[in-house]
Amino acid sequence: MKTIFNYMTIMALLFTFTGCEEEEVMTFGEERGVNFVIYEAAYGTYKDDYKNLETEYNFFKEYANNTTMELPPYQVSIGVQLEGEFSDKPLKVKVKAEPVEGYEQLAVELPEEVIVEAGEYRANFTVACARPSVYNEECKVKIVFDYDNSDVIAGTKERQEYIITLKDEAIWEDMYVASLEEWNEMYSPYIGTAGEVKVRFIYTALKNINYHYAWTNSLYYYIIMGRPTWGFTATEMDCLRTQLEAYNASHDAPLAEPDGTLVTFPN
């Protein structure tokens, strides 16, 4: 009887160990889950923060960094991170863009594919986002995984989408006013009536004489402080008129506001 008992005990233990081994194999399967993570391109670092998988950006200051009104796309860097074991072969991750309910969808350019190299568990990619076509309106896009065309499966639920929000909204307070109407009230006697296009063109035009964003805004400050002869002097006005002439000569239609009003500067 003792021999039978010992035999049964040994068999039970073997069964238990075998069950544990099978469970481990099931847990670490060949399919890897994937998640979005934050990628800080300036530092080349990743950050797993599922509560902040989003980017918000206002194009307005970019006019001061360019000499034309045709702004380049804004580049958004995004990271991806695998769950589970390292892979001994490269894994293809495909992403796609989806609309966000209630918002105009951004026009974006996505990479053909993202590759997580063998022995790695992270990779990053860039989304090129065009400037919204309408001023002062937020546009959004949702970047998600395209699992039908990827070598991976879904990872953690909270890390399956990345939201990009862009706008081209005038920052009136940087020009020391609260609105376009107040801009015209304060500055039109010196540089003429303005609209959304004109206030942006001023930045790009003055960039041609190496004025940066803050420097251009200082011209408004001088007017506010009662020193109009210090702001928008003959030098700045000559530049604005010259650049406007150059723009109109190089485009099929002269520079105009969305309602068709031509952009002009006083002589």
Please tell me what each predicted stretch does.
Residues 108-113:
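Active-site-adjacent structural elements in folded domains
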Residues 15-19:
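C-terminal motif of bacterial Sec signal peptides marking the signal peptidase cleavage site
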Residues 142-144:
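Extracellular recognition modules
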Residues 114-122:
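Short proline/glycine- and polar residue-rich coil/turn motifs
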Residues 2-10:
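Sec-dependent signal peptide recognition
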Residues 21-91, 99-106, 124, 131, ...:
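Intrinsically disordered, low-complexity regulatory regions in eukaryotic proteins
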